[in-house]
């Protein structure tokens, strides 16, 4: 076992490898940003954390908007879509009952939180995450979360959502 650990350390120490050993002085408090309802795909991170018995909390839009992020050291994003376009599953699942139900829930939750569109809600959530990162929080994003987070922030003040998502046209001057 020591031989394996030494090989790993040697590999990480190579200058051409973009890695670093980090000593954790305390166990990080982890939040998983995810809707409360069960989705038809698995999140490998929550599966690994659960299997490893590493504690984490599931938080979502209302908690983020209520400034809960500073309580956590690490935030994990997975299949989330911060653009208001309901993720990458539209083309394959737009007629699936779970997709239709999820879209209705997102729209209901946005209205409940005072937003007329899901894209407006998700932009504010993305801004809160940005503030969290700038304050020293660690973000681990994968899958569609990485792209949609950046797209949402960079498209502030533009309507980039097709009317199938938000019932009005996209801005005509997008380039």
Predicted region positions:
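Histidine (H) residue identity feature
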Residues: 11, 76-79, 162
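An acidic, glycine-rich "communication" segment
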Residues: 8, 142-175
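Helical hinge/lid and interdomain linker segments adjacent to catalytic or ligand-binding clefts
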Residues: 31, 35-146, 150-152
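Surface-exposed patches in mature extracellular/periplasmic domains of secreted proteins
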Residues: 3, 59-62, 162-166
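Hydrophobic targeting/anchoring helices
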Residues: 1-43, 52-54
